[in-house]
Amino acid sequence: MHHFVIRTVCLLLTSALLLGFAGCSSSKPQDRAAPAAPATEDKLILGAYTVPKEAYEKEILPAFQAYWKEKTGRTVTFDQSYVGSGAQARAICAGFEADIAALSLEADVDQIVKAGLITHDWKSNAWRGFITDSVVVIGYRPGNPRGIEDWEDLTGSDIDVLCPNPKTSGGAQWFVNALIGAGMKKSEVEKGEKDSAAGRDLLVRVMKRVKVMDKSGRESVTTFERGIGDAILTYENEALLRTMQGRDFPFAIPKATILIENPVALVDKHVDKHGVRAVAEEFVKFLYTEDCQRAFAKYGFRPVLSQIAEEFQEKYPVPPFLFTVDYLGGWSEIERNIFSETGIWNEVGREMTATESAPEPAAR
């Protein structure tokens, strides 16, 4: 009996203790957890075209990280994607959640606007949303064995030209615009008439000499550096970057060529979803600082700040018949007249396919 009483008391005490512990652990998990430390890191997703990759990775992103740390005490990291401008714009529209779109041409940003992802007026600042300029140039082999100086030099029957595909590369659209505009400029200078037929004619004659079409401007340059082709349509900044890297990459600036204006915009739907609007807005503003514009200039881009452009005027001469997209009617007209299904580019492409003179994609 004595042992029974002892065992009963022990069981009662054990039950009481278990109930006590159960009572202590009955609160919700969030009530038990220690308060979360305040976040000290921001992350931005940058979706850019291929050509400014070095400028961003080596100069601009590290500079902004240091600036943001000093200003806020917070660390900012970047997820980066670099593909052809058109492909990048389509990826963003299809679900790639870039916070910042840094592309080759305005029309690609407009795609993102039409998709409802950019909702603010991205062209409202003093530079109309453009962060860098460049011009279309012709790269050639060392020593210039073909004597290339201008567009007409690319039309000979024995010359092979490289150019990326306008369906995937913003750069290629600039090159098509440059050729059409240059033909019109020549007509205007020689005949006093801005003749679109002359622009189409020059485009056709040069495109007939295109041997390889890559997906992006960067891939096209890589193909050229493998020894394929006699000349390449490229960006001035791409050629200057190669020179900066110690490579022999001579080029000619045609007398009539187009001013390339490269846009940047934050993607409203994504920055709000990710909670990074403040740092994204600050990053876009940072791209217009003098130090950042100098960094772009170092890597071959023409700065949009006038005072920095003056510092680099010897490096970046202005060709005599430089024109902008406005000379061709602006991007809306260009999209309709040149790159739509019934536009000049597709029309020329169909003609070239019919005559079996269309260029082939690069071998991989």
Describe the residue ranges of each PLM region.
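A conserved helix-loop-strand patch within extracytoplasmic ligand-binding domains
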Residues: 113-185
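Early extracytoplasmic/lumenal segment of secretory-pathway proteins
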Residues: 24-115, 122-125, 235, 364
